[in-house]
Amino acid sequence: VYVLNSSIFNMYGGEISGNRADAGGGVYVTRGGGFNLSGGQIKENEASSGDGGGVLIDNGVFYMTGGSIDNNDAESGNGGGIALRYAYFAAISGGGITYNSANGVGGGICVSGGSQLTISGGVSIESNKAFLKEDQDERPSGQGGGIYVGDGGKVTMTHGRIWSNFAKSSGGGVLMAG
């Protein structure tokens, strides 16, 4: 699903699965678009060379109040489940982000480019993995199994659970890199 130019995608149920793209394997939001996830599944999608195996928000807005983002992969990028780059605003207040992986940073969620993420409610960020890239270029990798925050990103968490995540390098649960 590609959302741009102030369009809004509301997902109340159903499934987005088995898709592959360079970036934003399941959902890619850019240029002021928005995505509201309140039910359904985003699962088993892949970003083959960029960020956001399940969801990529690049200059857009994201709200998650329910549903799940599971078993997605950023094969050569960041944010296996969700990648937030220059997101205007993002809030997660329900649902689960589980069993995602990235061969970069942020197995579950990557927050970068000054993006702001608020986590509240009964959110579960569980069993996500950040692996080391094989090519080992200058960018960090293997950090922030559950959540990676870098490049001016900000996360505020008032409730939720981050558990049983893995990072090959550092920050199994969360890595805050500035």
Language-model features, listed with the residues they occupy:
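Extracellular beta-strand/beta-solenoid scaffold signature
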Residues: 1-2, 20-30, 46-57, 73-86, ...
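The right-handed parallel beta-helix/beta-solenoid scaffold, focusing on the short coil/turn
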Residues: 6-7, 14, 25, 33, ...
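Exposed, low-complexity/repetitive linear segments and helix-based recognition motifs
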Residues: 11, 36-37, 41-43, 64, ...
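Conserved acid/base catalytic micro-environments in cytosolic active-site loops
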Residues: 124
